[in-house]
Amino acid sequence: MDLSSKIPEFNSPYKIDEYKKRCAGKYLALIAEIDKPVGFKIGYDRFKNGSFYSWMGGVLPKFRRMGVAYSLANFQEKWAAENKFSLILLKTRKKHDGMIAFSLNRGFIITEETQITPDEETRIWMQKSLNS
């Protein structure tokens, strides 16, 4: 995905084969456009337990704080609920405080931290119930 290579937080973006592998089953891939692609969000049925895993997403820096990420997340959550998923799960890194704040503001809770050195690489697992 060419767009992911333009998101500065993604140090080493995944190759297309990884996207194909993860999206082999039930998935949702969204692209936001403002004359051109400016953001994306991809999720899939990773755990096969009624949860939907929000795997990857980002917005080009020039288009942040314009509601793009909010719109993508709203669509993903609505789609997941309509497709009988009960939870949205995501994993981020401690260094992505903007993503953590965005998720907390959307009603996610932190469920687990996987400590990694250096500390900013610590993985933060979050979830949001879709039944409310």
Model segments located where?
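Conserved catalytic-core motifs of GNAT/GCN5-like acyltransferases
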Residues: 89-93, 104-125
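Short alpha-helical
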Residues: 49, 94-98
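Acetyl-CoA-dependent GNAT
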Residues: 1-56, 60, 73
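Short beta-strand-to-coil "C-cap" segments at the C-terminal boundary of structured domains/repeats
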Residues: 127-132
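Conserved acetyl-CoA-binding loop-helix of GNAT-fold acetyltransferases
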Residues: 59, 65-78, 101, 105
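Conserved GNAT acetyl-CoA-binding A-motif
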Residues: 73, 80-92
